[in-house]
Amino acid sequence: MKRLLIVDDEPAIARLIQKIAKGCGYEVTVTHDADQFMDALVAGEPDAIALDLSLPSIDGVELLRFLAAARCRAKILIISGFDARVLETSGRLGEARGLNIAGTLMKPVRAAELRAAFEALDAAVPA
């Protein structure tokens, strides 16, 4: 089964991502802060990551640096309330560091957008 690791400090958003991902066949681990996220990543690398750029204890760019240093191979979906320019720049930064940035979504995110994003990931993530 495909594994998704979510890091989002907004429980309602994390639940929505989890629900849609499960419906798309993912086994999901939800984390709400950077420490939980890093612990879950060390426990076993997922096939995909849903990453919020705005966390209380660390920003998403620092998490992208951490993922690059860890040589993470997961497909990364960046989801944030920042504007499109910030999302695009973050995606390019991740790619420049060797990460597999699968896409970006701006909050508030709709279920249909999430479903489409996970279906696109399915084409590249083996079951």
Show the residue positions of the predicted features:
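Active-site residues of response regulator receiver
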Residues: 52
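Conserved acidic carboxylate
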Residues: 8
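Two-component/phosphorelay signaling modules centered on CheY-like receiver
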Residues: 11-29
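Short hydrophobic/Thr-rich beta-strand motif most characteristic of the beta2 strand and flanking loop
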Residues: 25-33, 40, 105
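Acidic catalytic/metal-coordinating carboxylates
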Residues: 33, 59-65
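Hydrophobic/aromatic residues positioned on beta-strands within the core alpha/beta folds
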Residues: 79-81
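C-terminal output helix
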Residues: 85-86, 106-122
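The feature encodes the CheY-like receiver
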Residues: 56
